[in-house]
UniProtKB/Swiss-Prot annotation:
GO terms for molecular function: glutathione transferase activity. This is Glutathione S-transferase. Belongs to the GST superfamily. Signal peptide: none annotated. Conjugation of reduced glutathione to a wide number of exogenous and endogenous hydrophobic electrophiles.
Length: 15
């Protein structure tokens, strides 16, 4: 589940 880590470390959709 690397996507979760990447997503968590990449708050691009953190409106």
């Amino acid at each position: 589940m690397d996507y979760l880590i990447t997503f968590y470390h990449s708050p691009q959709t953190n409106s």
